[in-house]
C-alpha cells in the first residue's frame, strides 16, 4: 500500500501508486478480456478494495486507484454481457498480508485463508461484487452514507 503522505508530497509517488494499483490491473484485464470475448464465455475475478468506495484521509491515493478499477469493472461487466463473460469485483476489507505488515492489526482484520471460501462461494453464485469478509458490505454502506460535512472531519 502506498504511503499517503509521500504521495501527497511527490506527484511521482502518487503516479506510481496509481499505475501499480489501478492502471496495471486495467491493462492486464484488457488482455484477459480479449481472450474471454473470443471464447464467448468465462469469468474474470479481480481483487479491488473497500478503500475504493470512499476517499478516506489515510489512503485516498490508493482508494482512488481502486475506485478506478471498480468503475472500469462495472462498465466492462455491462459490455461483456452479450459475450457470456462474467466480471467479479472482490472487495476485501482489512487483510493481513505482506502489503499490510506495517499496519497495526485489530478486530476487523482477516487472513487470506479465512476469506477465500466466501470468495469462491460468491464466484460460484455469479455475484458481481463480493465483500470479504461479508460484514464489510454493511460497514461500507454505513461509511458511504455519512454526510460529507461530517466525513471530511473524521479519520477512518
Residue ranges and their predicted role:
Residues 54, 75-86:
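Active-site-adjacent segment of SDR/Rossmann-fold oxidoreductases
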Residues 54-60:
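Active-site loop immediately N-terminal to the catalytic Tyr-X3-Lys motif
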Residues 92-102:
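Short, flexible catalytic-loop segment of classical short-chain dehydrogenase/reductase
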Residues 29, 65:
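Active-site helix of classical SDR
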Residues 49:
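Residue(s) in the substrate-gating loop at a strand-loop-helix junction
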Residues 1-15, 58:
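Conserved mid-core segment of classical short-chain dehydrogenase/reductases
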